[in-house]
Amino acid sequence: MVFCGLFSELIKGHSSSNNNGTNVSLAKTIQTNIRSQYSSDLSSYASACKKYSSLKSFDSLLHERTNSIISSLAAQAKTRSLNIESLMEVYGYLLELNQDTVRVIIESKEDVLKNNDLKALVDVYFKSTSKTLDFCNTVEKCVKKAEISQLIIRFAVKQFETETVDTDLGESKKKKYVKTLEEMNKFKAMGDPFDGEFVTQYKSVYDEQVLLLDELRKLKVKLGKKLRNIKTWRILSNVVFATAFVTVFVLSVVAAAMMAPPVLSAVASGLTTPIEVVGMWCNKMWKEYEKAVKRQRGLVLTMELGVQANNVTMVNIKFEVENLSIRISSILKTVNFAVDREENEMATRFAMQEIKKKVEGFTEKIEEVGERAANCSKLIALGRLVVLGHILGLHIVEGGAANIISSV
């Protein structure tokens, strides 16, 4: 869905610098006018929720899940910056919404098969999920690079242990750890596999997904009069709209919170007020978000300027909180320490002992991120296959539907 496609680059954009020192302008990305642009669509959605019990149930579940993710992120923001675990939690939320939409499309099977206009709506689903798959592929490529880095540093540790017990110093004592240092230089040359392309694409993809939301609105206007009395059209179009709209909201909140964490607390506090009118909770959330962003706008822009002025080192940048990159950065620093003091045996021994402590956590995090990316890619691909099968009337993928739904 649009929502998964949006998040697919958020994790790429949480860092503010790439290899060339350029910055992703998150402050310019933050959306504050979406609610006013889609006010009529929100009213239409609220009316449809009152009319159709299935849509009302969907709205209740969407509301509950959105409350949960915003509250969870707000709690995290009180004690620390948002990190990769936070972003993966958001990704899980968006993935659940994707599966909910798959269910709705499957339930609308017969009508979609008979109606070319409804197929156009489903096209929006395929456009957005293709972005999600691209993201998963990017993550998996970075994980493979990280795995190579891990093998190199593990070999360096093994080499160090061998050279430590080697009493045959040969020509000079300073050459005792020469092979260890060679391997560490290789690791250093690999750099951070999660830097570069991985952290620079958020802005462009975010804009593209907002345009996709606008495309959806135009499609609704075009077909709305023609299909206004068709129950399936009203339910399906409102499900797609609501999930797309809420996704833009959640990702806008996260983008703002990376600059100014108080935005999350302000939005979360607004969720505690009961909302009487079904379907209008998302409108209220946007209001709270807009007020919070206006209050924090100066801080957001100030912090962005601070990032631009202080991107000399990753560890001093507020947004470089992704745990795997931090582990890699930590190991790289220790490698630099050893390499810069290659003639000092004690320095090398100290550095290698530190690396041995850090490499286990590095390995575990690589595996975790790789498994997450592979699983998400599989679920999204299967969801696309299930939807396509239902549109074409191919029942060979019925088993896949059960699998994807049970995976949520």
Curated annotation (Swiss-Prot):
GO terms for cellular component: membrane. It is found in: Membrane. InterPro entries: DUF677 (IPR007749). The chain crosses the membrane at residues 239-259, 262-282. It is a multi-pass membrane protein. Keywords: Membrane, Transmembrane, Transmembrane helix. Its main location: membrane. It comes from the Eukaryota. Belongs to the UPF0496 family. This is UPF0496 protein At5g66670.
